[in-house]
Each structure stands twice: as C-alpha cells, then as structure tokens.
C-alpha cells in the first residue's frame, strides 16, 4: 500500500494513519509513506526476503555532533560522524521493531494544525542490531536501479520523537554522495532487520536491474567511478 499520509490524510479523516500503517506492516502488508510506490515495493521485497517485518524511513537526518561525541565516538567500532544518520519517520514502524512504544501525535503537523487531528503516531526508538538498508527505484525514463548497504542500528538513545533510530553504515558519507544523491534516489530507504544483501542482490538481478546499477557502500580505499582520486 502506498497511501497519501502526508499532508492530506489528517485533514480529511481527523487523525494520522501512522499507527494503522504500522499494524498492517506487522501483519506482512507493507505500507509506505507519502505515496512512495517504489518504497512499498521495496518493503514487499524485503518482507519476502527476510521473512520478517520491515520499515521505511527518511534517511536525510544527521546525528547531532554532540550526541555523536558523547554516546557513539569510540564506543562502537570506528564509526565516524559521517557513517551515522537518524533513520526517522513519524510513527510507521511496527511495535515489534521498537524498544518501547507509545501512541502520540504528529509533532510536525501539529505546528500548523489542531493537535486532535494529528493523533495516531506510534513512537519509539528502533531496536538495535544488524540491518540492511536498500531500495528499488525507477528513473524518469523507466530504467530500474537499486542500492543495498549493510549496517546496524546502534543501542543509543535518540532523544527525539517519531519512529527513529541511530543507524551506522560503513562509509555512509561517500555512499550517500556517490550513490544516493548521484543516482537521484528519494529520501526514503527500506530497512530489513538483519543482513540480507546477498539475497537482495540476486533478486535485483533477477528482476532485471543491471549489475552496474546496483549501488552499494564501497569500502574505504575502493573508489566510486565519479569519486575524485585526489580528494
């Protein structure tokens, strides 16, 4: 299901559908946010591959530098600040994938709307552990492409709202620039709980994604085709 939760739903029905969406996803019926059709398809693929609940998150939120310095640096391997990001959505992640959960209201929408019509989010920090961050997408001329990256959700409190977690992916900064931005990917990424890159790679090949269009997070020292070798 790819529903128009933002910004139209709450003004028509008097509540936000985040919690309902999370319940459907928990039952194996993936629901994407903001009419993200390829996001819903990516979630479905992840559900089948992982045989588990998945989620869909915004990937364009950074981890505050002070939080990184206090709670992450030197405590979880060699992750740099650029390797981390806040995976966030209003409240669509299933309760079984949250460390604790609570029904709340959509704080961003409530800045301009009555709180009573923004009720319906399911909020909490996402469970720590291994994840696969991935997406299938089409270009404007109907050419399909995809990306896959292994990483983890860190066991660090986000101190924020929504369904949210602190994600760490090796060389995420370079991956973000040379795959996500250069590939014109939207700001939503699907998340499977575990490492499923090997299977996802074969699935993407099977459905016709050219191997050169399957992006992944290159290890340090392995250059992206457009990466400046002198940088």
Where are the language model's segments positioned?
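Hard-cation-handling environments
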Residues: 2-15, 69-70
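Generic structural signal of hydrophobic/aromatic residues within well-ordered alpha-helices
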Residues: 16, 20, 45, 200-203
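Extended hydrophobic packing segments that form well-structured cores
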Residues: 106-231
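A short, gly/pro- and small-residue-rich
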Residues: 13-31
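Structural signal for hydrophobic packing residues in well-ordered secondary-structure cores
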Residues: 9, 46-53, 204-211
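C-terminal catalytic subdomain
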Residues: 25-161
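General beta-strand structural signal in soluble alpha/beta enzymes
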Residues: 2-3, 55-58, 214-215
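Short, low-complexity, polar/charged sequence segments that are solvent-exposed and flexible
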Residues: 19-23, 74-78, 209-214
């Amino acid at each position: 299901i790819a529903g128009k939760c933002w910004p139209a739903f709450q003004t028509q029905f008097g509540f936000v559908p985040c919690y309902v969406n999370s319940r459907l996803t928990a039952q194996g019926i993936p629901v994407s946010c903001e009419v993200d059709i390829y996001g819903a398809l990516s979630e479905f693929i992840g559900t089948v591959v992982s045989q588990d609940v998945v989620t869909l998150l915004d990937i364009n939120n950074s981890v505050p530098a002070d939080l990184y310095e206090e709670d992450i640096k030197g405590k979880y391997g060699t992750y740099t600040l650029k390797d981390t990001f806040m995976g966030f959505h209003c409240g669509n992640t299933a309760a079984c994938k949250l460390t604790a959960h609570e029904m709340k209201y959509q704080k961003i929408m409530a800045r301009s709307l009555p709180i009573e019509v923004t009720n319906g989010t399911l909020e909490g920090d996402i469970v720590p552990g291994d994840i696969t961050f991935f997406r299938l997408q089409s270009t404007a001329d109907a050419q399909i492409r995809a990306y896959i990256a292994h990483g983890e959700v860190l066991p660090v409190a986000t101190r924020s709202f929504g369904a949210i977690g602190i994600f760490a992916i090796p060389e995420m900064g370079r991956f973000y620039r040379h795959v996500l931005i250069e590939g014109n990917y939207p700001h939503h990424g699907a998340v499977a709980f575990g490492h499923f890159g090997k299977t996802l790679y074969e699935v993407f090949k099977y459905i016709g994604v050219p191997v050169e269009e399957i992006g992944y997070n290159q290890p340090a020292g392995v250059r992206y085709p457009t990466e400046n070798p002198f940088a």
